[in-house]
From Swiss-Prot:
The keyword Electron transport does not apply. Belongs to the glycosyltransferase group 1 family. Glycosyltransferase 4 subfamily. Signal peptide: none annotated. SUPFAM superfamilies: UDP-Glycosyltransferase/glycogen phosphorylase. It catalyses: queuosine(34) in tRNA(Asp) + GDP-alpha-D-mannose = O-4''-alpha-D-mannosylqueuosine(34) in tRNA(Asp) + GDP + H(+). Its EC number is 2.4.1.110. This is tRNA-queuosine alpha-mannosyltransferase. It is found in: Cytoplasm; Nucleus. Keywords: Cytoplasm, Glycosyltransferase, Nucleus, Transferase. One of its GO terms (biological process) is central nervous system development. CDD domains: Glycosyltransferase_GTB-type. The gene is gtdc1.
Length: 437
């Protein structure tokens, strides 16, 4: 028992990561708070954990997400402050798109900066997350009226590294409709290839490249598979933007079968304003006004304040809705993703995108903003630059759903798997004990 895991917001991807580490890494002890009232967790969790965590001289490493004010806990519990402290950023508050700025909102980003200063290693789930945080520190601190601290980026940056969120891709074969099975088998074969060619995440910040081009991501597929693909596919340009949609001609299901069912769009995100549901529903309502046929599943968790647009859109979309609301059963959730054709993100605040990668694993065609973390994760063909371009892509897919159903994902999800990242997490959490313990 040497690794102390602390999660102040034990839900969603935060829960997934802690559960995975707790299951896969020996000697872990996990302390959590439920994923409710995020703002209160960020303000007060340190005081709770000060009392809840039992003293134990076997602890050598403390691993926590950035929801916790690590600086407070380190002072309140000097025994924990002496541990090797690792801070993991799922998201950062320095660029959070608040609807109405209030002075108290400053505290959340400020807490994260303080936590970085006391941490020994600061880990981000993407290069975008790391760079957006570090380069925003100076601007963020300008909100302080006077006597501002200096050079904090230079102090924090040497501690920083990128270690992607480790995905566990479950067996979904039982949920796949017939037209997805061939493509998914091919994708599985590609995922099982040697992953030594994948972009290397590094625990040394100075070795971390933060530029991920479309060509770099595409190159991970390999030349031999690309040659085979060129021999077995045809391309049809049905996107108004000019982006090619690649068809898998080896799949022999009849085109008229693919064309029968309306396009099924899924939106599997938190029901909160930072995921920009307004843009998503405006695009869908425009499709409906044009009398285009489609089905939609709106999944994802809900919290205390649900934007009004959800209740309004539910009424307006009417019979187009197949699923509406959070699916607590993981199997039900995966089945809903497997039945969908296209997964859409309209997020204004995203640093990795677990839900999008889960949907891609289930055979969905991803459509993401050409911003935030998405260019780091997805090839350019899956990115859109504006709501109008998103509308045009969905309009064309509504007219030709068979094109989407023939498509095979052109990226590489294997580099985000636990199998690819296990070694780096083990190295991170197997740090040598400090001499002063």
């Amino acid at each position: 028992m040497s690794v102390l895991l602390i999660e102040a917001f034990y839900g969603g991807s935060h829960k997934q990561l802690m559960d995975l580490i707790n299951q896969e890494i020996e000697g872990c002890v996990l302390y959590t708070l439920p994923a409710k009232k995020w703002h209160w967790r960020a303000r007060t969790a340190a005081l709770y954990f000060m009392q809840a965590i039992l003293p134990d001289d076997k602890y050598r490493v403390l691993f926590t997400s950035s929801v916790l004010n690590l600086a407070e806990l380190a002072v309140l519990r000097p025994d924990l402050g002496k541990l090797k402290k690792i801070l993991y950023f799922h998201e950062n508050q320095l660029i959070y798109p608040v609807q109405k700025t209030q002075e108290r909102d400053f505290q959340y980003g400020y807490n994260q900066i303080l936590s970085c200063l006391v941490a020994d290693i600061v880990v981000f789930n993407s290069a975008f997350n790391m760079e957006s945080f570090l380069t925003s520190i100076k601007t963020f601190l300008k909100k302080i009226p006077d006597h501002r601290p200096k050079n904090l980026e230079e102090i924090i940056r040497p501690k920083c590294c990128v270690l992607y969120f480790p995905m566990t891709f479950p067996d979904i074969s039982q949920f796949l409709p017939e037209h997805k099975r061939v493509s998914h088998t091919l994708a599985d074969n590609m995922s099982s290839m040697d992953i030594s060619h994948c972009p290397k995440t590094s625990l040394q910040a100075e070795n971390m490249s933060v530029e991920f081009s479309h060509d770099q991501i595409q190159s991970s597929i390999g030349e031999s598979s690309a040659e085979q693909e060129r021999a077995t596919i045809s391309e049809k340009n049905i996107c108004a933007s000019g982006d090619p949609v690649i068809l898998n001609a080896s799949n022999t299901l009849a085109g008229d079968i693919r064309q029968k069912k309306p396009l099924h769009i899924v939106w599997p995100h938190r029901w909160e304003h930072d995921k920009d549901p307004e843009t998503f529903f405006k695009v869908l309502l425009k499709l409906k006004e044009k009398e285009l046929t489609f089905h939609v599943s709106v999944l994802g968790e809900t919290f205390t304040d649900v934007p009004d647009i959800f209740s309004e859109a539910r009424i307006t979309l009417g019979s187009s809705v197949l699923h509406w609301g959070y699916l607590a059963s993981k199997d039900d959730y995966l089945q809903a993703l497997c039945m969908a054709d296209v997964v859409v993100s309209t997020a204004k605040h995203e640093f990795f995108g677990v839900a999008m990668l889960e949907a891609v694993h289930c055979g969905c065609y991803p459509l993401c903003p050409k911003s935030l973390v998405y260019p780091e994760i997805f090839p350019a063909v899956y990115l859109y630059s504006s709501p109008e371009q998103l509308y045009r892509k969905l309009e064309n897919f509504c007219k030709r759903p068979d094109v989407v159903r023939r498509h095979r994902f052109q990226g590489d999800t294997a580099r985000f798997s636990w199998a690819a990242l296990r070694g780096e997490f083990r190295s991170l959490l197997a740090a040598e004990p400090r001499e002063d313990l």
